[in-house]
Swiss-Prot record:
Belongs to the PNP synthase family. The active site is at 45 (proton acceptor), 72 (proton acceptor), 193 (proton donor). This is Pyridoxine 5'-phosphate synthase. 3-amino-2-oxopropyl phosphate binds at residues 9, 20, 194, 215-216. Its EC number is 2.6.99.2. HAMAP family: PdxJ.
Amino acid sequence: MNPIFLGLNIDHVATLRQARGTRYPDPVKAALDAEMAGADSITLHLREDRRHIQDADVYRLSELRQTKINLEMAATQEMLEIALKCQPEDVCLVPEKREELTTEGGLDVASQKAWLTDYCAQLAENKTRVSLFIDADDAQIHAAKEVGAPVIEIHTGTYAELTDPAAIKTELERIRKATDLAVSLGLTVNAGHGLHYHNVQAIAAIKEIEELNIGHAIIAQAIFSGLPDAVSEMKRLMVDARQQAYLG
């Protein structure tokens, strides 16, 4: 059975801190607690506008984390220099718009292949694995392969927002086909965005998906049940769904 891994996104711990400009809650402490509760990696998005995660968070987590870091960032020169300094195990390149509340869609890899080819190469030379956050689109998957990224993260936001059962089924099939294509090209497939306790199972049941990156839902649930329980419950749902997929 292919295992399924949980990456906890700690951005919204930092969002709460920045709302009052305090020193608490500490996203790095949240990361360490989540690791103890079963999170397999920690995801954090250092945005250009620094609206939640700050540079100091990235550097502190780099020194203290027990699992691995997945640093989400825009493909800019500034972010490249930071990634080269802190050397996260993984970098996930994402699109950014200053006016958006959260990442609204996948990266357009096909339109910037030359830039991303060089960008991915520099990170690879620094022993950082590169992931590209893209929509479940054949052209973008082929482009990801061409620029040298070994991993893609499929944007599940569209799936997460749907309520009509037929539309959900169609979107799941699109994600499955995209996953199959990526695997056939030798890419590792992760997924994330908008996943929560009531919709994660269908994505976790796609056997070829290796990791799910989830943040908002877990941090929200932590208000009521505590972070360790929120993390362990999400991990349990994911693992159960993966096991059921193999049992048929």
